[in-house]
Amino acid sequence: MEQIPQEQKTEPFLASFTTTEKLGTETPTTSITPNTQFRGRYEKPNCAVCNEVGDGLHFGAEACRACTAFFRRSVALSKKYECRAGRNCEVSSNIRCMCRSCRYDKCIEVGMNPECVQNRRENDTPKADLQFDTSKTEIRRPIPNFNIVPQASAVPSTSNFMDFSIFKDTPISNFSAFSPASLPGLSSSPSLETMPLLERMRINYDKMENARNVIHRREGENIFQQKVPRAITFREATEVTTKEVSLVADWIEWCFDDFGLLPVDQKTILFQNFFVFFCMLERAFMTVKSGRDGIVVMASKDYIDYDNLEGFFKECNSGTGGTPAEIAKLIRPSFELQKRSLINLMRLENVDSYEFFALCVMLFWDFGLEGQSDECNEVGRRVKHRVTREMTFYLRNVKKHEEPLYRMASVVSILPSLQRAVRRFQEDIEMANIFNIYALPENFVNIINGKFN
């Protein structure tokens, strides 16, 4: 019988629970105050399955060691259980012979993810081999071949880090903006076991970045060399946005198993509502990471120069009702709103990659959209609850925030600013299209207004 890998210990995350912090005094670190004892108990909730003393977040839910081992063994060995009492047995640690079928169902109900067990087993390989076979750590299907670029077969096998050093005058870390090791204050990197959804989004985002490196490559540009960003025109910006539709749609499907189970009409409703918000949120996030002011970074890693909007609209005066200078004057307030209410706020809050992914989850799984089914609403609620649990774990145990709830509230407060910026942008595009102020491709207008398939 194949040996089941043992549970990875979580002592690094829990070490701080047994010591006190220095709050301006020389209190010995070995003393334990009542407040510290309370905080330690609070930060280790009981097992969500059997209510036994918890051992932290495992496979996406708070669980004790026994339930964690039971769930791993059940999934790894593909166990099939049968309940003899109508699948309504009590699951509690004080029951000597607990119904295994109901116990497993309870594990799934509280959010434990079977895929994390399988991927954990796949990752049980010697460290020396990991650098040569990174595909075993991935949890999505391979990136499809994109026919837009003939040379798409030569996709680099290593992760395409987001390197913003070319925007800066001073050297920066070689770490990716999306690498856990690059985040300030991290005591340990998150894992697929402790944060399955957010970590899966990060892994798949890196793969989408590799695909972008191919799709948005300029003629004569080598995909294996570091891209040199440049200011782009309005026409080029619309092309980038149009190409992003299929890439982002694939990323969403790679990240959420629940999405793949929905009917096509529900998938369309969710994605049409999400795409333009995601584009603007991601641009703001990448702009903040670039460290430069007066620009907005696109998915292609090129940028729009706020200080030269006439150059941005230089190709828009053919057969339209305005010159580049007039168009720039008309559109500038919209760009200023993006900078003032969204980019500056994200810079102030210093949003990191996992917080960015959590915002993406909140945006995508919206509630009460026109035509959205009750089933789709319920699926979205469950996914958002899962990511909330993971963010609580991340902020408390990894980033060491004393008040993770306040931090989460600060991050979520970005969403109203994003909504204002998107609505203003949509209004400007609609006005330009109606009055023919500048030439707009029909498919781009439909994308911005969420009317595409």
Swiss-Prot record:
Pfam families: Hormone_recep, zf-C4. One of its GO terms (molecular function) is zinc ion binding. Residues 1-37 are annotated as: Disordered. Residues 18-36 have a biased composition (Low complexity). GO terms for biological process: regulation of transcription by RNA polymerase II. Coiled coil: none annotated. Residues 178-451 form the NR LBD domain. A zinc finger (NR C4-type) spans 47-67, 83-107. CDD domains: NR_DBD_HNF4A (cd06960). The keyword Zinc applies. Keywords: DNA-binding, Metal-binding, Nucleus, Receptor, Transcription, Transcription regulation, Zinc, Zinc-finger. It is found in: Nucleus. GO terms for cellular component: nucleus. InterPro entries: HNF4-like_DBD, NHR-like_dom_sf, Nucl_hrmn_rcpt_lig-bd, Znf_hrmn_rcpt, Znf_NHR/GATA. The keyword Transmembrane helix does not apply. Its main location: nucleus. Residues 44-119 bind DNA. PANTHER family: NUCLEAR HORMONE RECEPTOR FAMILY MEMBER NHR-86-RELATED, NUCLEAR HORMONE RECEPTOR FAMILY-RELATED. Belongs to the nuclear hormone receptor family. Orphan nuclear receptor. This is Nuclear hormone receptor family member nhr-12. The lineage of its organism: Eukaryota, Metazoa, Ecdysozoa, Nematoda, Chromadorea.
